[in-house]
Amino acid sequence: MKKKSVWIKADEGGWEEQKDRITTGLESGADCVLVNPGDVEKVRELGNITVAAFARDNKSRADIVVVGKRGEGDGTKPLPQEIPGSFDINAATLLMDKGVTVGGYVVIKDKHYEHFAAEMGKICDYLLVTGTDWKVIPLENLIADLQHQKVKIIFGVKSAEEARLAFQTLEAGADGVLLDSGNPQEIKDTIKAARELESESAELEAAVVTRVEPLGMGDRVCVDTCNLMQRGEGMLIGSQASGMFLVNSESDDSPYVAARPFRVNAGAVHSYIKIGEKTRYLSELRAGDPVTIVDSKGKQREGIVGRVKIESRPLMLIEAKARDRTLTAILQNAETIKLVGKDGTPISVAKLEKGDEVLVRLEEGARHFGKKIEETIIEK
């Protein structure tokens, strides 16, 4: 899941207009705000967010200094005949030499500016490019030219629709977008688009239940998140890293307890949980840790752990077969604990029977400290 960042451009108009953009961005989960140097501290008073500032020095103590406004980058000054004579590139180089995180800002007016942007991208941490007439071709060219550089390409857009196109240009897409819009809905939709595109779908398949056996008492982990989950959403949990069950959130009401859609009653303390491309032990999770929420179609999104409870409870062994593999999970023996059926419908472990089909995720290879490795391993 490659991170796609959203920057909010808030350097024009009065402070109240800029403030509205910034607060909407903060509330919606934007990654960075780009302002004028005099507004850096004002932004920090509003909330905790990365602040970039248009400048040629770092007197504002911004997290990122962006060079190019009122320079060659935006066309205020003419482009240099030779790169070593560039006003903007020299300023960026001096800042980089001082250990400052630097962005280069270039408005793509024609092919000459595209070449200039590529040169800026070779020395800066970030390359912010925008067009006078929004086109994909310059972005494609820059992604191709700079694919082996460390620079992150942030493409200027005015809507969520343009952002989606920028994120999906070529295979890699832009690393982020610089959104220039005062429309609160466009800000929210752009950030939503970024988060959706960060997540690759998990390939789920049906496994046939072969064994359901009550066990004795043991310690189980309950994961309470800072996120509300829908029916059919939960987490991938299992006793083997090579295959995990989709354990449903407590999103359904029952005769005994109200729904708790923020919770996944996840499994015994030894169990693995899949988080992104890695696995962790359930018992290792702490408040503030990221988790991966998965639905019955395999769509993934990031969640945040709010609290983890480990308590002694009666347990149940679930065994199922998918392809030629036998998978197991040990869950709490209670009606509110559910796996997700082949059709996306949650099935309580208390009603689970041999022959039922439930959704699982199979993995190839083994795991070493949670990372996938090419190795033969047998887990029973």
UniProtKB/Swiss-Prot annotation:
General function of this protein: Catalyzes the oxidative deamination and cyclization of 2-amino-3,7-dideoxy-D-threo-hept-6-ulosonic acid (ADH) to yield 3-dehydroquinate (DHQ), which is fed into the canonical shikimic pathway of aromatic amino acid biosynthesis.
GO BP: amino acid biosynthetic process; aromatic amino acid family biosynthetic process
HAMAP family attached to this UniProt entry: Arch_DHQ_synthase
Protein name: 3-dehydroquinate synthase
Key words of the record: Amino-acid biosynthesis, Aromatic amino acid biosynthesis, NAD, Oxidoreductase
Keyword Amino-acid biosynthesis in record: yes
Native source organism of the sequence: Methanosarcina acetivorans (strain ATCC 35395 / DSM 2834 / JCM 12185 / C2A)
EC number: 1.4.1.24
InterPro entries listed in its UniProt record: Aldolase_TIM, DHQ_synth
GO MF, one annotated term: dehydroquinate synthase activity
Similarity-based family: Belongs to the archaeal-type DHQ synthase family.
The keyword Amino-acid biosynthesis is assigned to this record: yes
Catalyzed reaction equations: 2-amino-2,3,7-trideoxy-D-lyxo-hept-6-ulosonate + NAD(+) + H2O = 3-dehydroquinate + NH4(+) + NADH + H(+)
Top EC class, one word: oxidoreductase
Lineage: Archaea, Methanobacteriati, Methanobacteriota, Stenosarchaea group, Methanomicrobia
NCBIfam families for this protein: PRK02290.1-4 (NF002626)
Lineage: superkingdom: Archaea
